[in-house]
Amino acid sequence: MTRAMYMSKLYAPTLKEDPADAELASHRLLLRAGMIRKEAAGLYSYLPLAWRSIRKIENIVRDEMDAAGAQELMMPIMVDAELWRESGRIDAYGKELVRFDDRHGREFVLGPTHEETVTALVRNELRSYKQLPVNLYHIQDKFRDEFRPRFGLMRGREFIMKDAYSFSATQESLQEEYDKMKQAYANICERCYIKALPVVADSGEIGGDTSVEYMALADAGEASLVYCDDCGFAADDEAASTKVVVTEGPGDGTLTKVETPGMGTIEAVAKFFGFPENGTRKSLALIDAEGKPVVAIVPGDHELNDCKAEHVFGKGYRMMTDEELQTYGLHKGFIGPVNLPEGIRLVCDENLRESKQWACGANEVDYHFTGACPERDFTVDEWADLVTVVAGDPCPHCGKPLSAARGIEVSQVFQLGTKYSEAMGATFMDEDGKEKPLIMGCYGVGVSRSLAAVVEQHNDEHGIVWPVSVAPYEVAVIPLDPKKEECANVCDQIVEGLCAEGIEVVVDDRDERPGFKFADNDLMGFPYQVVLGKRGLKNGTVELKDRATGEREDLAIDEVVAKVAELVKAARR
């Protein structure tokens, strides 16, 4: 049996107007519905309604993790910085890592993830293959000092995450754990009513060479992804690769210098030659992470992918300044591979490797080359995957055109391999008595992000439309005249009946106008509303409203409890 909550006592301060700084629907509606409040940039308090939904998401996560054989524990938020030095991540992570000294001058970090902590935890305990595999998880606040916190709960500095870590003796065992987690994450999304697409992803600072993200599709999502309707391939734009169809440039194959006055853009050059932008070559002057000059070249109609560029040029690479261009003898808008000044590394996109006729800058103001050919006219120092894949590019699996979408990352799985165990000396004895590093996987679910993703996918012009499984309350009982004895008695009867059925009920007993109550309840988004109106009570009926469909149905007072209980229990996941 559950206990009802009464809105006269509920702390849920709703807002009539949209907050000025709320960009996403989820941010706007969670603020307006009295569910979260901003304390500082990227820091939010979860008010009672949101916290109930958070706990439901956490419990769904626990159900699926436990069913997959994982074990829950709790590790400290405050982590000894020496562990991060052991792994080599303390500097690589950058300024997002919150670092501080305690009163004794010992350095600590606030954990954004816990690979180091869990590896240190098990390295003296998991010593034999007989103890493996093991999968450990916890649900905890995390901290990342985001440069630009935005989108409400989507990109905050403090957030709630479930992170799990598996330890295996063999690659085959890791694959089994990885597959279990992928299935668990698919189940979590389904039970939370999040429409999510598993996409190939970049492993980023966490590491490893295999990763999949679960992206909640949303027009206002922060991440870009591409997918194939034909074969099902999907990847985020940081990891997506393809074979771009490259057009050969104009000319007869002979290296020819052409005057192009004032034409310092791809668009202007393509128009001048009467050729598609794909037939030109875009040259970008960069400074790599070591401070050395680089020119990167990609097809003219594609952009340099920042994540891929970090893999090639190092984290912290950047575009050259105007002063640096002058220092290295380069001219903005007219940079190219032919006659490139000495000491500048040339890296070209892999898609250009087979192209033998380039239209590109001539490294001289107001001039371009046509017919430039790699190896004959210039030497490429490195070929690499550099471009951002876009809609219309061919699928790398089946060759059909890719589609593009935006999404919200709600969870991600990684095969870490031995990155952390080797660095931190976490080893075990195998069947042959040989000492080997533990083989690791890690698996994260953004719990607070999932809350925002649900709202992002489930809302309308009136407010949030909660799915039953994660709704703060499943049913709102709305007596329009709660001070009248008949209305109060019927309300008590229905509430007691629903609570006896285990239904989670909130009662809008506030002394407010009906229109105000309807608007507030629609904004808060409880899945079902039972409305007790004067006319209906006179006829022995109440109105049942389905918040998702807007459908209304008059039910006899003695039938409403059974009907609502049936609907709610069927919709729970």
Regions found by a protein language model. Give the residues of each.
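NTP/phosphate- and nucleic-acid-binding module
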Residues: 1-573
